Each structure stands twice: as C-alpha cells, then as structure tokens.
Amino acid sequence: NSEEEAVQLFEGIRKNSQSDGIAPYADLVDHYQVVSKTFTYSKNSTYSATSEATLWLRGKGSYFQIQGVVGSATRIQTGTSTASWVQLYNNYNASFPSLSVDFVGSGYFTESRTHSGGGSVNINGFNLTGSTAYTDTYSSDTMSLIWTYKLYA
C-alpha cells in the first residue's frame, strides 16, 4: 500500500546517506498543505466549527512525510449565521517525521440577538449568558474538535 511504499522510500534515503552524514536530498521536495475537518454542534446543526492546520511535507513523487505543523487553529465555519467562535484550546501531537498528526481543539459559539423588549429569543442548544435592554447574548456548550489526519488513508 502507499503508506508502506512511503516508509520504504524514506528508509532507503536514510540508508543511502553518505558516510559524512549528508543524505542525497537534492531530489526531495518541500510542500505545504492545508488540512481541515469541520464539526457540527450536536445541539444545533446550524452551527459548525473547523479545525485547520498547515502541514510541512517533504518527499519525492507521490510519497511524502509530515515534517511538522506550521500553524493550526480552530474557527467558526464560514456561513455559520452571525455567531462568533471562542477558541479555548488548540494543539496537535505527532513524532516528526510522521505519516499522521492528531489534532485536539475546543471552543464554543456566542451569538447576540436583538429584540424589541419584554422578552428574549431562544436559540436551541444555547444558554442565555448576558442581557441588556434589547440585546441578549447566548453561548453554546463547549465543543470538542478531535481528529487525526493521515497522509495515506
């Protein structure tokens, strides 16, 4: 399979290193790839958040290894109403070079709704967390964004 071929390619490169420790990396290519996964809030499917990362890959032909994570973040999914996303945690785990990376993030949505007074407007799956004369602020429960990116699925 592709994963085994990739491992064999990189093992061959390591074994063919010159005695002075310089490997023949001239034909290897660095590549940056954006990966992401979108999660829907279980209590209200109108709201979605995305975990996104930019990976640094190095390889040859169609065989690459992940050398590192250049950046990662969680954010609200484009088109998710007028809500805001509050990121609480964002991290990743892998022993580089690697063929996969584990991502872990969490956060919650907030949304303000204006009303004409005398009552509030409910949002399914949200709790009222603040109120002024004509504006109520709602927050969702904390949402976990946990996933694994595999270079060769």
Predicted regions and their residues:
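N-terminal propeptides/leader regions of secreted preproproteins
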Residues: 1-39
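Short helix-loop boundary/capping segments
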Residues: 32-102
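Short, low-complexity, Pro/Ser/Thr/Gly-rich segments in the mature regions of secreted, periplasmic
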Residues: 137-153
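Glycine- and small hydrophobic-rich membrane-insertion segments that are intrinsically disordered
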Residues: 111-136
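Intrinsically disordered, low-complexity regions of eukaryotic proteins
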Residues: 29-32, 54, 104, 138, ...
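Generic "edge-of-domain/loop-turn" microfeature
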Residues: 46, 62, 110-116, 152
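A short, surface-exposed interaction/processing loop segment used at functional sites
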Residues: 67-72, 130-132, 136, 153
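A short hydrophobic beta-strand element
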Residues: 97-113
